[in-house]
Amino acid sequence: MTLLTYSRLTGVWFLAVLATVWAIASWLLPVDGDLARVGGYAENDFGWRAPQTTFDKNLFHVTTDLKDYNRYYDVVLLGDSFSCDQESRRFGWQNYFINRTGLSMIVIDTRRYWPQEIMESEAFKKFPPKLFIFESVERYLHERVAYFSKETPPPKKASPTALEPLFATAKPLGVAPHEEAAKTKPGYDPDHVLGHLGAIFQRRTHLNNQVLEVPLAKPGLFSSPNDRDLLVYFDESRKKDLKESDFSDLRSGISVFQKIIESNGITKFVLLIAPDKTSSYAPYLKNPQDATVNLVAEVAKDPSLPVPRTDKILTEAIAAGIPDIYLSNDSHWGSHGHRLFAKAIADFLGAPDKN
């Protein structure tokens, strides 16, 4: 083979690859969901199609730097991706909660800061909030909370003054959300194509098993073209290893966590659990062994714990046939799921509802 022939063949090969990438780019929708992105699943198959209800701007402040927490907020929320990573979509549950209650809120990432760091911060001591919310996805709940069962809470201080009711002066904002259509135009992004193909290769060769495809027994639970399979993170199955003693430690840990937060005599504590897909959609899985334990129900065996039944309000909506309570391409909820999650805590706290 001459150098000229080799150069021509290389050029033809390069053009063929370029044409293939561009052809895929003209078909592949922009990446939207974390499960689709990590697992190498196309938004063309798993992207949501029904409109989602969004706000023009977020009503809460998220920080990844504790230095930003330097003034009074009615609510301090320490949470994970269900609270911190939903800003771009503008339908995070905090928007619905704040819109209904009028309370001010700062959101801090629990993947960066331990609860103890928040409690020991100058702002928390100087400007104690009316409400402290700890939010965790279900599959990481035990490791994030059960260890508190070994702690000894400090004695509760007497409040220096009569505590004002949580919603005494708060006024609903009355912001009107609006519907936003799904993005169904190709992204024409070669970098996305290469990343997508790389993720597919890793999944097919079992180099990356972070996302699992679980078959569903019931279609119509999602508005995506593929509504026959449930995408989930593999580590949802970690709950299958939990025993009754772990559930007991979890309940005890929540109780101690509450006593620690409320020891200042001012702040009320609530723990929010974001249920996993494999527990929320358990009745609709083709293989029952794919379902995982409902930790919200396990925690609720102690009715004294300040834990709203977020599981019930979500599963009731799923049973009613409302699609996209969770998004097919994502581990998080659609706008309706976020709204219901906000309703669960607002109702639990006795927030006025003028709607």
Which residues are covered by each model-predicted region?
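Extracellular glycan-modifying ectodomains
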Residues: 1-355
